[in-house]
A protein has these predicted regions:
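Conserved redox-active cysteine motifs that mediate thiol-disulfide chemistry
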Residues: 126-129, 134-151
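Thiol-/selenol-based redox modules, centered on thioredoxin-like
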Residues: 216-239
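Generic structural signal for well-ordered beta-strand positions
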Residues: 12, 20, 120-121, 221
């Protein structure tokens, strides 16, 4: 039992460590990670008494909060006696929010401004693909994404494609300093409300960087895009 958790934890740690500077190792660990992830889920939901266990919802919440399919299966298996369990409530809330940000769902419309006060409204860009990257001045992983985003920007110049970075800072000075330091060629907008703002809430942003692609009809086309797969995915739109 404990071995299933240990194996998953070890692979998750190794894979996360490799993401920064060893892409080949990261890629080689991905199928092992997926296998350990699936085994962990199967182990938790098949435990005797899982349906009525006060502890099982905590594990589901901790490990599978981002997985709509697994979350739905786990919730369907929980007994009604767990309805007042705080983690079941969290899982349900999370599940409902995740459903709203799946590909094919309408993208939440927002109006945000950049540091100079120029206003951008998402629905003004209907007819174009829109990439939205959620980022922050303090986010090291986000900075690693910048070269890949710049490649996307260069590859889509002159096409019906626009990009935004939604800054997740709460401090205006930090936001302004970050904008000036990185001088990105696309708009960086913010409501300075970080995770509690309506934009982050409606896009269910719980970790960054988080990247969405919105289609010309204003629907979510893809999310969790990163690095080379993001570049390839977007290049294919214009082939």
């Amino acid at each position: 039992g404990a071995g299933v958790f240990r194996r998953f934890g070890r692979i998750r740690y190794e894979r996360s460590k490799a993401f920064k500077d060893d892409r080949a190792r990261y890629d080689s660990l991905t199928p092992l990670y997926q296998e350990a992830y699936n085994k962990l889920f199967d182990y938790i939901v098949s435990l005797p008494g899982c349906a009525t266990s006060q502890v099982a919802p905590h594990y589901v919440w901790e490990y599978f909060a981002e997985d709509l399919d697994k979350m739905g299966k786990a919730l369907a298996g929980f007994d009604a006696s767990l309805n007042s369990n705080v983690f079941v409530a969290e899982c349900r809330d999370n599940w409902e929010k995740e459903k709203k940000v799946q590909p094919g769902q309408p993208a939440y419309d927002f109006t945000l401004s950049d540091i100079d006060g120029k206003v951008y409204k998402l629905s003004d860009f209907r007819g174009k693909y829109v990439l939205i990257e959620f980022s922050a001045s303090w986010c090291g992983w986000c900075k690693l994404e910048i070269p890949y985003l710049k490649t996307v920007y260069e590859n889509t110049k002159g096409k019906n494609f626009v990009m935004f970075t939604v800054n997740m800072d709460e401090d205006r000075e930090k936001w302004e300093k970050d904008v000036k330091e990185y001088n990105l060629p696309w708009p960086v907008v913010s409501d300075l409300k970080a995770y509690s703002g309506p934009v982050a809430q409606n896009y269910h942003v719980k970790g960054i960087p988080m990247i969405y692609l919105i289609d010309p009809e204003g629907k979510i086309m893809a999310r969790d895009l990163r690095r080379e797969p993001m570049i390839e995915y977007i290049n294919k739109l214009f082939k």
